[in-house]
Design a protein with these regions (language model features):
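Conserved, well-ordered alpha-helix/loop/beta-strand core segments that scaffold catalytic motifs
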Residues: 51, 56-84
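Alpha-amylase-like alpha-glycosidases and glucanotransferases acting on alpha-linked glucans and related
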Residues: 1-59, 84-210
Length: 210
């Protein structure tokens, strides 16, 4: 368990801390707002250890399954959502990587414009990435995210792949009307070139629908 915690500290610590905070009834908008003594108290709580152990046990069993499938000549394809939830450890621990206002509320949300699937478009409610902030950190959050999932899968399908090229920005005061959104430019190949510099080519399947 300790080895797993050390190898996955970059995401597991924040994830377990976030869930421990919620389980104990606390409501703190971002990790940076937690006082040091409170953070130490939460980390020592058995709830924190429980959430770490659940992840350890899940990936232990998952990797056993993957190994068995690979031995039988079967590969596993992961399916990665493009966006994350506002109510997540990702946003909570890294608010600077999302388009949020001073009170840490989304200034815009994700969705799609009107098309033949929906005359009114779609408003998903997910917070949008701050791609300028991501670029300053060499897309480290995304690079690690892709690398992690490829470690546990033989190939990775990324949903809403077109969002890397451009994405539909719906102002937060218009979240009920996706028609009032507009297109914004995404990171494009820059993100994947950064990934390749660190990890080489990747077996990625791009959703070609939307």
């Amino acid at each position: 368990v300790e080895q797993f915690k050390n190898e996955n500290h970059y995401w597991l610590y924040d994830y377990a801390l976030y869930l421990t905070m919620k389980d104990t009834g606390l409501s703190i908008k971002s990790k940076s707002m937690i006082q040091e003594d409170l953070e130490k108290k939460l980390v020592k709580d058995s709830t924190f250890s429980f959430h770490c152990f659940v992840q350890y046990e899940f990936y232990k069993q998952w990797n056993d399954l993957k190994r068995y499938c690979n031995e039988k000549g079967i590969g596993l394809i992961g399916d990665l959502p493009f966006y994350v939830s506002y109510d997540s450890s990702d946003v909570w621990a890294n608010p600077h990587l999302y388009l949020l206002d001073k009170s840490l509320e989304p200034i815009g949300v994700a969705g799609t414009p009107p098309d033949y699937f929906s005359e009114e478009g779609q408003s998903w409610g997910n917070p949008l990435y701050d791609w300028k902030a991501m670029k300053k950190e060499k897309y480290d959050w995304w690079v690690k995210r892709i690398a992690f999932h490829l470690k546990h899968h033989d190939a990775l399908r990324i949903d809403h792949f077109r969002g890397f090229e451009k994405f539909w920005y719906i102002p937060n005061d218009e979240t009920t009307d996706a028609r009032k959104g507009h297109w914004e430019k995404g990171p494009g190949l820059d993100l994947f070139e950064q990934y390749e510099r660190q990890f080489g080519s990747a077996p990625i399947i791009a959703e070609d629908l939307g």
